[in-house]
């Protein structure tokens, strides 16, 4: 079935899509994947900043480049992750493999890419990504609407 008003999983994505479209940036499949990428990248950076002994050699100048992976995250990136997932049958593992590909593009990160997702479970990623999406939706959308309503 193609997605339309009659085949949407809920009225939120169906008849109310015009009113809730702004929330797609926080709660869509694309958004969840992007938040997972963000959490994995920030976790890796945190391991470098500790520093985890094996990551002492990571140049801190690469941190902004790593953050740009999620800041500039595209539909093509999300599709690449979905393609990886079709092989792995594991959504979070697909994010990890995607990030390893991105590290390969940077060069000089071969010794460090095995520390992506180091010591984490998929639930660690999901249980951080979903609340982050809720937090950002509240701050960037919901509070603005309630503030506007209070002003009226």
PLM-predicted stretches and their roles:
Residues 148-152:
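A short, hydrophobic C-terminal helix/tail in secreted or cell-surface proteins
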Residues 1-147:
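A helix-coil-helix interface module used to build multimeric assemblies
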């Amino acid at each position: 079935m193609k997605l339309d008003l009659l085949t949407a999983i809920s009225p939120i994505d169906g008849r109310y899509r015009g009113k809730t479209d702004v929330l797609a940036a926080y709660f869509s499949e694309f958004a969840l994947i992007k938040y997972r990428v963000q959490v994995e990248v920030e976790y890796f950076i945190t391991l470098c900043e500790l520093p985890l002994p094996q990551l002492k050699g990571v140049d801190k100048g690469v941190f902004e480049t790593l953050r740009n992976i999620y800041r500039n995250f595209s539909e093509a990136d999300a599709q690449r992750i979905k393609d990886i997932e079709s092989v792995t049958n594991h959504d979070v593992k697909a994010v990890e493999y995607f990030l390893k590909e991105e590290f390969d593009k940077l060069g000089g990160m071969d010794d460090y890419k095995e520390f992506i997702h180091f010591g984490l479970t998929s639930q660690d990623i999901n249980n951080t990504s979903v609340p982050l999406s809720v937090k950002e939706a509240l701050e960037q959308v919901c509070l603005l609407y309630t503030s506007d309503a209070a002003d009226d």
